[in-house]
């Protein structure tokens, strides 16, 4: 049997075998056996030394063709087997797109943030600026410009976290009002602002007190400002937060930075003023302090107190949230208990 005939038979025998191979490993073994250095085609090429000079090129070319044809068959089968592996994997990992997905919990603003955002939006609608200031504040702005000099007995009303003799953790957001009054150009219009933020006092933490809490103070300065302007503003704000049927009353009080000063009560939104545990059976709930800006505060900011006047108020968003949602422990706001916090999630 001549070499060409052997090569043809080799191709026919292995062509069928290759097409029936079931795995890539088995196919690789056949590749090595047929096309490797010890394979039959290599053996045929080595035997060409016994051929005549005329036969040698023909047989060599035919042997190379058979090797290329077998390589092509092997590559074709390899592609089929690889595709079969992919198809099997896809079949085993099929995703049913009609199945409901696992819900992803979305974040939501904290209840205090919601209250503050709501109040800020209300006052911005009335033309107020929202201005924030540093939490590490100068004694000068925190106390002295608020008519509370170093020897003033009112400093005993709130213990303060001092960093140095002149630097402290602000105990109120009023310092931003002082900073703004110093710079405001009243020839361009009145000053209307709120200053929300975190304040610090050396209180023992309990159900109604915290060493760190939120405050929002408001200030209006212009010519011809009266107590009626203050009352109308606070009535609109209380009706916005606690319900349109609410009324308010003003009781005389004392704050160093306002004169006259008042405590503001809102009619109880739980009992409608009839008396209940929330309002301690009085029909009224204390919600904030306010008053007309003290002339000394205006003068400290180089504002002519004979020409300009104004009103100021301060409220606690934490207290507003407690009252509005019936929460009896301020510490609940500062825990990571999702059972509590998710009750106030905003939808949409």
Curated annotation (Swiss-Prot):
Cofactor: Mg(2+)
EC code(s) of this entry: 6.1.1.20
Catalytic activity, reaction form: tRNA(Phe) + L-phenylalanine + ATP = L-phenylalanyl-tRNA(Phe) + AMP + diphosphate + H(+)
Cofactor note: Binds 2 magnesium ions per tetramer.
Residues annotated to bind Mg(2+): 259
InterPro entries assigned: aa-tRNA-synth_II, aa-tRNA-synth_II/BPL/LPL, Phe-tRNA-synth_IIc_asu, Phe-tRNA_ligase_II_N, Phe_tRNA_ligase_alpha1_bac, Phenylalanyl-tRNA_Synthase, tRNA-bd_arm
Localization, UniProt: Cytoplasm
Pfam family, one: Phe_tRNA-synt_N
CDD domains noted in UniProt: PheRS_alpha_core
Keyword annotations: Aminoacyl-tRNA synthetase, ATP-binding, Cytoplasm, Ligase, Magnesium, Metal-binding, Nucleotide-binding, Protein biosynthesis
A cellular component term, taken from the record's GO annotations: cytoplasm
GO function terms (MF aspect): ATP binding; catalytic activity, acting on a protein; magnesium ion binding; phenylalanine-tRNA ligase activity; transferase activity; tRNA binding
Biological process terms in GO annotation: phenylalanyl-tRNA aminoacylation
Hydrolase is among the record's keywords: no
Quaternary structure annotation from Swiss-Prot or TrEMBL: Tetramer of two alpha and two beta subunits.
Family assignment from sequence similarity: Belongs to the class-II aminoacyl-tRNA synthetase family. Phe-tRNA synthetase alpha subunit type 1 subfamily.
Name of the featured protein: Phenylalanine--tRNA ligase alpha subunit
Species, as recorded: Lacticaseibacillus casei (strain BL23) (Lactobacillus casei)
Taxonomy of the source species: Bacteria, Bacillati, Bacillota, Bacilli, Lactobacillales
């Amino acid at each position: 049997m001549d070499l060409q005939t052997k090569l043809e038979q080799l191709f026919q025998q292995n062509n069928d075998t290759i097409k029936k191979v079931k795995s890539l490993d088995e196919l690789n073994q056949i590749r090595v056996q047929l096309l490797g250095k010890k394979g039959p085609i290599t053996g045929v090429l080595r035997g060409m030394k016994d051929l005549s000079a005329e036969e040698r090129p023909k047989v060599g070319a035919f042997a190379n063709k058979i090797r290329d044809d077998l390589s092509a068959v092997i590559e074709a089968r390899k592609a089929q087997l690889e595709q079969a592996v992919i198809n099997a994997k896809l079949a085993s990992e099929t995703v049913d797109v009609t199945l409901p997905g696992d819900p992803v919990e979305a974040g939501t603003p904290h209840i205090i943030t919601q209250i503050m955002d709501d109040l800020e939006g209300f006052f911005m609608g009335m033309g107020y600026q929202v201005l924030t200031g540093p939490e590490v504040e100068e004694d000068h702005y925190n106390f002295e410009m608020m008519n509370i000099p170093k020897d003033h007995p009112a400093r005993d009303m709130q213990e303060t976290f001092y960093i140095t003799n002149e630097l402290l953790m602000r105990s109120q957001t009023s310092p931003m009002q002082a900073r703004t009054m110093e710079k405001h150009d009243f020839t361009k219009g009145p000053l209307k602002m709120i200053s929300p933020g975190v304040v610090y006092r050396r209180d023992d933490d309990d159900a109604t007190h915290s060493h760190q809490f939120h405050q929002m103070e408001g200030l209006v300065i212009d010519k011809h400002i009266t107590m009626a302007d203050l009352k109308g503003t606070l009535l609109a704000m209380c009706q916005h937060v606690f319900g349109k049927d609410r009324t308010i009353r003003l009781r005389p009080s004392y704050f160093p930075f306002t004169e006259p000063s008042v405590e503001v009560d809102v009619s109880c939104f739980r009992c409608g003023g009839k008396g209940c545990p929330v309002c301690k059976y009085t029909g009224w709930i204390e919600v904030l302090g306010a008053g007309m800006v003290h002339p000394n505060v205006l003068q400290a900011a180089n504002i002519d107190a004979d020409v300009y006047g104004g009103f100021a108020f301060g409220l606690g968003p934490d207290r507003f949230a407690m009252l509005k949602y019936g929460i009896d422990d301020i510490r609940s706001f500062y825990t990571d208990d999702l059972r509590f916090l998710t009750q106030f999630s905003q939808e949409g």
